[in-house]
Regions:
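N-terminal secretory signal peptides and thylakoid transit peptides that target proteins
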Residues: 1-16
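Gly/Ser/Thr/Pro-enriched helix-cap/hinge segments flanking short amphipathic alpha-helices
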Residues: 43, 61, 364-366, 406-414, ...
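Blade-edge beta-strand/turn elements of extracellular beta-propeller
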Residues: 44-46, 117-126, 167-177, 244-255, ...
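Repeat-based blade/solenoid architectures
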Residues: 53-74, 125-137, 176-187, 231, ...
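Beta-propeller blade termini
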Residues: 72-82, 111, 132-146, 158-161, ...
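Hydrophobic beta-strand segments that make up the repeating blades of beta-propeller
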Residues: 85-92, 144-153, 199-203, 277-282, ...
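Short, conserved, GDST-rich strand-edge loop motifs in beta-rich repeat architectures
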Residues: 91-104, 205-230, 392-408
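Beta-propeller blade signature
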Residues: 108-112, 234-240, 291, 348, ...
């Protein structure tokens, strides 16, 4: 437990609760016409209501202060019907036994109507299934061309197979991935590069209603206990056998660790050896960086590479996490959301096998110090080619202001703009009022729901309404969006690394990934911001697929969405829709 968290949780809370080489001929894709660009200041505008989204998370809280109540829930972005428009899945929890409300609460699948609005199709899709859901991860695990859904829960997790006709079937038991316990985040990735997606699921603590402990703030009322009150619970690794079933290989892979209390997880290739590694954010226990040993096993190198503890050697309360090349070095760095008074962590990968803690030098420490950050991720909201940072914040104790007035339960999100030279600036107040509205933030994801080229935001709130924030005027710069289709690799190219090179020689690295954030997942297509508009701008890209194959494409026009098939080059291209100031 960190000193800062001890001050809050113990002194103040009185021990309470709380990727074969191949080089196809150069391809331009579709010629990109001149765009009538939006102009003006970038604003993230709340369009939730007009988009037809009415999801509200149900924590099931009724006064008993069960710890899972304050942990949910996540959101996932997917194109479940392959129409080229991103859809949304919100994870929901439920009422506790014996305290059932008037209506059932389910996850919510919203179909993109292609006009700025969404329709709730949960029941028609076969997803109206109650569970105490916390997180989700989506991917085409059976390589049939349709994205499937995995939901983490307190209890039995659920795997819903996409039938390809707008409906899903619960195949949890048949697949063997129920994984009972207190699960939070999940990652679909191909750790053995066999072309089939495997599944990693984080577990938090050994908790059940029967094991619930009494913690109090004032010796009168029950409060949420801290994770130190409970034992940890090992995360799980499932190997995809290729026949629709999975095998639990956690112990064989060297990942069994019942001391960890894991919440967020990110897939990355931190050493650029072509094999997927895993980073796991732990709450009040050392973070783990599992290096892939190329033989079906992993080794924890978190301590030796410098990401297990803070710069001062303390454990933190890690929640969400993401990996990305924010300094354009060609190496993936790590971003972690932590507890109040710990600030966010930013570990820069220096390419030598070590990470450097740059939370202070980057400028993110001061502005994130009082925030309790759950979801966090890298994304390029202004398309200047540099990865920015988003953080969703919210405390875990609904009465924290009673014991520490300077802290609030509902907290505003934070948007950090990457100004170059490894520096960030807080621009939350410069992009409109929506991000300044305090919410009990938990999950978050980015997506281009309106296909205008820039990235919009989804934020969930604990026991509150979800929000869709449209990025307005964010597409004033040139860009390229890339979707991958694997052949030897998994169908969606998850784990593929794409390096874009501009005519000026700038190199941008992005990876197709699942998971990251907190209990959530952003869209799979990659977005490359290309900076100021230039007529006839072209770029080249190199793709390193999980199979090891390399595809090189040159003279690709900017301002389009291209689909690249492994070994075949560009198989589809369309111009990016013209951005507008209003939907």
């Amino acid at each position: 437990m960190t000193q800062d968290r001890r001050k809050i949780c113990c002194a103040l809370w009185a021990a309470t609760s709380l990727c074969m080489s191949y080089a196809p001929r150069p391809s331009r894709g579709a010629a990109a016409p001149s765009r009538a660009r939006a102009s003006g200041t970038i604003e993230f505008r709340d369009v939730t209501k007009q988009a037809g989204i009415h999801f509200k998370h149900n924590s099931g809280a009724f006064g008993k202060k069960y710890l899972p109540e304050t942990m949910g829930s996540g959101v996932c972005v997917l194109d479940y019907d392959n129409d080229g428009w991103q859809d949304i899945l919100f994870v929901n929890s439920m009422d506790w036994p014996g305290h059932k409300g008037a209506t059932n609460t389910y996850p919510a699948l919203y179909h993109n109507n292609r006009d700025g609005t969404f329709t709730d199709v949960t029941r028609e899709a076969g997803l109206a299934v109650e569970s105490y859901g916390l997180g989700c991860a989506v991917a085409d695990y059976d390589n049939d061309g349709f994205e499937d859904i995995y939901i983490t829960t307190v209890g039995s997790n659920r795997l819903f197979r996409n039938l390809g006709n707008g409906k899903f079937a619960d195949v949890t038991l048949k697949a063997g991935v129920a994984d009972s316990g207190f699960s939070a985040s999940a990652v679909w990735f191909d750790y053995d590069n066999d072309g089939k997606l495997d599944l990693f699921v984080t577990h938090y603590i050994d908790w059940s209603i029967a094991k619930d402990q009494y913690c109090t703030l004032d010796n009168k009322n029950k409060s949420y206990c801290t994770p130190q009150t409970y034992k940890g619970e090992s995360s799980t690794l499932f190997h995809n056998k290729g026949d629709g079933t999975f095998e639990n290989v956690t112990k064989r892979a060297g990942l069994h660790d019942p001391t960890s209390k894991s919440l967020g997880a990110a897939m990355l290739d931190y050493d650029n050896d072509g094999w997927m590694d895993l980073f796991v954010a732990n709450d009040t226990e050392p973070n783990k960086l599992y290096r892939n040993n190329h033989n079906g096993t992993f080794s924890d190198v978190g301590v030796q590479v410098g990401v297990a503890f803070s710069e001062s050697g303390r454990v933190r309360a890690g929640m969400g996490v993401d990996a990305g090349d924010y300094d354009s070095s060609g190496w993936q760095s790590l971003l972690i959301g932590n507890f109040t008074n710990e600030s966010m962590s930013l570990y820069r990968n220096d390419g030598s096998g070590l990470f450097v803690d740059e939370e202070i030098s980057s400028g993110i420490r001061q502005m994130s110090l009082q925030a309790l950050t759950f979801a966090c991720f890298f994304f390029d909201y202004d398309l200047d080619g540099r990865l920015d940072i988003f953080a969703a914040n919210g405390h875990v104790s609904d009465d924290i202001s009673v014991v520490q007035p300077t802290l609030k339960y509902a907290q505003p999100a934070i948007l950090f703009h990457n100004s170059g030279n490894r520096k960030f600036e807080d621009t939350s107040a410069k992009v409109g009022p929506a991000l300044q509205q305090p919410v009990v933030g938990r999950g978050a994801a980015y997506l281009d729901y309106d296909n205008d080229g820039d990235l919009d935001l989804l934020i969930t709130a604990n026991n509150g309404p979800a929000r869709l924030l449209r990025n307005e005027n964010g597409n004033q710069n040139d860009l390229l969006r890339v979707k991958l289709v694997g052949t030897r690799s998994n169908r969606e190219g998850i784990g593929a690394k794409v390096t874009l090179t501009t005519s000026a020689g700038a190199r941008l690295l992005r990876m197709v990934k699942t998971g990251s954030s907190y209990a959530s997942q952003s869209e799979l297509p990659l977005t490359f911001g290309l900076g100021k508009p230039e007529a006839g701008k072209t770029v080249s890209i190199e793709i390193i697929w999980p199979s090891g194959q390399k595809d090189s494409l040159s003279k690709i026009s900017a301002d389009q969405f291209i689909t690249v098939k492994e070994g075949s080059g560009i198989i589809a291209a369309r111009p990016i829709a013209v951005g507008k100031s209003t939907p």
